[in-house]
Amino acid sequence: RGSGKVTFGNRPNGFYYARIVNQIPFEKILRGNPHRSFAVNFRCKPFFYHGDVNQLTITESIASFTNPGTVYSLPKLTVTGSGEVTLMLNGKIIDLDFTGISGSIVMDSELEECLHSDQNASAAMSGEFFRIPPGENAFAWTGSVTSVVIDPNWRSL
């Protein structure tokens, strides 16, 4: 039994998160004949994640982008900056305080974690983690930001 990403032949351009729910008969597989057949049963989470999605790198304080999915995505944002920073996505606000932090802060909306160098940086963040709705989205920031890299995790039902 295991879990991970699974891609099906009828939807080769992405994947589901799934886990195997039945026993795989490895002892039968390993006995001589290399051509064995057996069933593998998966329990999949409901979202189809779009494959081959490029990260969005934003270097200007105002930008827009489109979520091609049919449901909101839970992005991972890597913000490089200094001082006090405000991020805005469609009017929703996250404040970041880089005091004592050099480099980047990573905000993972799926895990609801805010990290700096793999260490908890929750105290540096104020606001709710972003969800990117389907369609056109407006993004902006104020403060001293070098870049925002968004791993969008586009998905559909």
How would you name each of these model-derived features?
Residues 2-46:
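Short beta-strand and beta-hairpin "edge-sheet" elements
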Residues 48-157:
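Intrinsically disordered, low-complexity segments enriched in serine, threonine, and glycine
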